[in-house]
Amino acid sequence: MLTDTQIREIRSRFNIFKHKIYLNSCSQGPLSDAVQAGLEDFMASWHEHGSPWELWVNRYEAARAAFAQFINASPDEVAIVTSVSAGINGVASALNFQERNKVVMGEFEFPTMGHVWLGQRVRGAEVQFVSAEGNCIPAANYEKMVDRNTLIVPLTHVCFKNGFRSEVNAITQIAHRAGALVMLDDYQDCGTRPIDVKAMDLDFFVTGTLKYLLGPPGLAFMYVRQELIASLVPTVTGWFAQANPFAYDPKLFDLSPTARRFESGSPSVPNVYAALPGFQLLREIGMEKVAAHIKKLVQSLLSCAHDLGIRAKTPADSAGPLVVLQCQDSTSFVQKLAESNIVASNRHDGLRISFHVYNTMDDVTAVVEVLKKNIDLMVRGPARVGSYD
């Protein structure tokens, strides 16, 4: 468990906490001194050398190796892409919908996941959505729909609008028993607890750096299980997907034998420089400690909301780093928080409060005080069962 002194030291590395209470890591993580130094390092290399591509590519590969270690994968199983959307599109373009054509996903997915797979209907995909029960989607609901005609099960780890954490292990087992692939979107969780893609038995894993990995927008990582790589030929591609990008031969289509075949154009070098320190900072702290600290904060806010009679959209027994409370007017409540120098966000009727390792129990107390003063803006009573509103 992290001590108060350790948390204060971590918090001091993020300038925003000098004047704000920041509880919006589910949208964008705050800027640390380490990430700022990474960006300045890139600027210095650009000023000094102009176009030091050998240096930049080395840093690019260092980021790949760091992320691979972060999720217990091989660097050859990791693609660096511009966004999670780009990674998902790359995988979708490589799949054949002739023998199996069903894509089964929950209705809590981020819109990109639905849009990408619905876009594959012109190639023969049949997209089916698993219905929720209240603010949860039980694994049993997937079992009713996944069958021998299912090609892939795209799955969000933590829902962006209610904080529900999916039963990843159970759903993965259901999919694999039917011979289907599993893709996990971990954007709303990665960086808040240890991740082991091998232990989770995943086929694909995608996440970006801008939230809990404490990095910039414009950079994402995708894991592809080693045994699958050679059989997948993405048609969403580019020169950095080739075995030798620097061959400069437009007549040669020679994909990398590694997950790099899912990459595309020139890498976003500034974002690579900024992302690497985010990984390093989290690893220095220790992911087990990060997870334990976040869990304590989440449980505290959920308990306080319960005591105030406020309806939580986040199930207490399956929560990630994001707590969502139901509002009469979520936009107005976010403004009320802003008036107290608290940064949060909303989606539909949900107030989103997200925690990370730099947050404290004092942050929870500050939110609770605003809740008490504006209780009329909140929805009262227990969470509804049987509908997601």
Regions found by a protein language model. Give the residues of each.
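Pyridoxal 5′-phosphate
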Residues: 1-389
